[in-house]
Every structure is written in C-alpha cells, then in structure tokens.
Amino acid sequence: MRIGFDHEKYLEEQSKYILERVNNYDKLYLEFGGKLLFDLHAKRVLPGFDENAKIKLLHKLKEKVEIIICLYAGDIERNKIRGDFGITYDVDVLRLIDDLRGYDLEVNSVVITRYSGQPATNIFINKLERRGIKVYKHEATKGYPTDVDTIVSDEGYGKNPYIETTKPIVVVTAPGPGSGKLATCLSQLYHEYKRGNVAGYSKFETFPVWNVPLKHPLNIAYESATVDLKDVNMIDSFHFDAYNKVAVNYNRDIESFPVLKRIIEKITGEESVYKSPTDMGVNRVGFGIVDDEVVKEASKQEIIRRAFKTACEYKKGYVDKETFHRAKLIMEEMNLKEEDRKVVIPARKYAAKLKERANKSETCTVVALELEDGTILTGRSSELMDGTAAVILNAVKHYANISDEIHLISPVILEPIINLKVKTLGSKRTALSCEEVLIALSICAATNPTAQVAMCKLPMLKGCQAHSTTILSTNEEQTFRKLGIDVTCDPEYISESLYYNN
C-alpha cells in the first residue's frame, strides 16, 4: 500500500497542540467529533493513518484526561446503527467503555441527552447503573438555539446536573453525530463558571480538514460520508474576515458560530478568544499528509464506496431519496463512476455470464476481490457456500499457490455442518456462510497441512477491496470487516424473499 500520511508526525503535532490549548485554562472541555476508535473512514482516505490514532493520542495524555460519553435518547429509542460495525449506538457505548478502559483511560460517566423518560432509554440507564457506571440525564435545553438569555440561566443549562470531574482535560465523545456533545460541554462550562472555575471549550474534529482546499477529494469524501446529515463544506467567512486567511469548515459549525460565540461570552462574561469556528478546533491532521496524490486517489475511492453504501441503505429503507441522490451527485460532480472501483466490472461481468448460462431472472451473487498485488479473483454463490466464502477460499489458495482443483475442506466435514444447520437448527438456507466455511477450514487445518497453509494466509487479506453483485447479509459484511476487507454491494437483493434474504 502506498502511504500518504505520516502517523507519528501527526501524533506528535496533535498532542503538543492540545497541551498548548489547555494551558490557558484550569480545565478544558474537548469535544471529540467523529470516531474516537476504529476511525475507518480516516484510515481509508488517509493511507497510513492509524484507525486508533485518537485513542493512542489520549493514552499519551492519560494522566491529564478523563472521558464523558454522550448518547441521545432518541438514538436509543430508534435503535440507530453504527454503520461500520453494524451495532446499535447503545451497544457501541458499552464497547467504547471497554475499549477506553483497555487503554487505561478513565471513563467519568455517560450522559443521556434530550432525555424525556423514554422506556428503552430507562432500561439502558438501569443496565449502566447496575454495572457501576455513573449516568447523568440532560433534558432538552430551554430556549435553544436562539434565546441566549434563557439558555445561559438556571432555566437552561442550570437545569442539567453538574458532572463532577477532576482532571484538566475532559474529553466529551459519542458513538456518532447529533449526540449532544456540544450542549454537554457548554452546560459544564456554565456550571464551572458559576463555581468560579476558569474553563474553556475546544473542538477536535478530523474532517473537514481546514487547511486543505475546499474541493479537495479529502474534504468531498467527508461530505459523502455525512450525506444523511446534509453537511456541506464551506469557506469559513469568519476566519477570512478575522485573519484574511482561507480555512474550510462545514455549514453546521459556521451557521451556529454566532450563537455559540454569544453563549460562551455570556457564560464567561468576557469577549470570546475565538474569532471563527476554525479557531475553536485543535485539528492538525492536515500537517500529517506526506503524499497528496495518494490521499486524493484514496478519497475518490471512498466517494464511490459511499455512493454504493447509500444506495444499499436506500434500498433497505434506512435513508430517504434525497440522501440517495445526493451521494450519487457528489460522485458524479467529481467525474467518478461506479466502474472506477476496480472490483465492480469483474463481479458484474461474471454475474451476467452466470445469469445467461442459468437462464434465470434473479441476480447471481458474485463477489470480486482485489488482492494487494492487483490480482482480481471472483467467487460465486452455490448450494454449498455463499459467494463471500468462495472468494475467500480462492484468495487464500492464490496466496498459498494451491491448485484450484484441490479441495481445502473435506466433504466429511461439510456434510455434518450442513445437516446441523438445516435439519437440526431448521435453517432455510443450505449454503454455508463465510464464517461457517472459515470454521470448517480451521477444523480441516488440524489434520490437513494444505488447509493449514491456506489458513495462515488469511491475514494477507487485510486492506483488500471487494464488491458483491447483491446486498450481503449483516453477518457476511461483519465477517469481511473482521478480515479487514472493504466491501461494497450493488443495491440488489439475491431473491424476492423478504425475511430469508437476511
């Protein structure tokens, strides 16, 4: 893989900048936008970026940091899904707490924002409290977003309970956008000043990157990733007016800045040190880019990937038509098309060939996989196994120089697994999933040296690109994710079945 980003340089620059910012205050509330852990978007668009860079940065500062996690009650009620992991936001909070503790970072508490006694939210609160985790409930702020006098009063932020913290840097994070991070920071700021403490607010958001051009593919890829939020990158006019320098920010931050500035000034009783939304940020990711061409190409590929993802989400009913069309429009505005993703054409061509041969109207599932050396392999679904499993077996055979004629998994192993699945567990689908086939391969590896050699090649699939001609099940997507394979799908179901497609 060609590297476009220097991870070590970035870590050094970023930690230094955060410490400089905290020196101005007794306590700094640092709003962490984007993903704190497993930032797969950043990893894809910035080749060389460590997906866990942010948490490693916090680990470096662990003596000075504690963490508050925000979760919007409405996201619990509607079971909002974190797309890259296929888990709900409330489950992601539990995962996040475990991961933070694994890095020796102190989790102060969980804040439920815009709470109004929702039933599913109450169950989640009970679950946390019975495991010894502090939970605070913040209701919707009265007067927000325009009535600053009410917002900054005992009727506004004052109604929220004060979260007791002990360290100079308080990181406020969440599973995703719209979780109430900013409101939590400002509520805390209000309480700190009422107690006579000098506290500050800053924002750490990786995208958009303020010091690369507005129409750079890296920033356009961010628009594509947040297409459901309708985020649009813009020139920060406040920054230009104050410093005569061009900086990029996004519409929500720019639109909310005048009110945010007034709120901070009313809380502190002083003129804000921030002249622009860009001033509020501490992001130094742009300084880690070492090869702009590599980053541009990776970002273009991400835009195509996002268009596929949004098309599938539209088909599943998760997003509206406007979001679907916007993702497609962003791709077309960059003069990109679906076929610019190398694995798309081989998958579609093979599927068309199989469809013609079988003389069926239903789409055949074919998965194409591009290996690190540029080789593209395909696998198709059969009565025995899914296309995902077939292409993985073909890939490990390729890496291990095993002939295509050799069977890695003995029928003696496969038959009882299929019998268990269909006859005992009552599954409607006889075909084994990718995970089931990998388990079967591992069993064979115990007695078959060839299977063992193939098994050892699985880590080589990390970072590979794949495309499926039909929508994959959540289970198949998660297996590919665990293997480190980025997969896209055509927005087509494998059959007309409604439940058994999954």
UniProtKB/Swiss-Prot annotation:
**Domain of life, per the record?**
Bacteria
What InterPro entries is this protein classified in? Answer: DUF1846, DUF1846_C, DUF1846_N
Bilayer-crossing regions: none
* Gene3D superfamilies the UniProt entry points to: dip2346 domain like, Domain of unknown function (DUF1846), C-terminal subdomain
Pfam families, alphabetized: DUF1846, DUF1846_C
Protein family: Belongs to the UPF0371 family.
Protein name (record): UPF0371 protein CLB_0371
Which species is the source of this protein? Clostridium botulinum (strain ATCC 19397 / Type A)
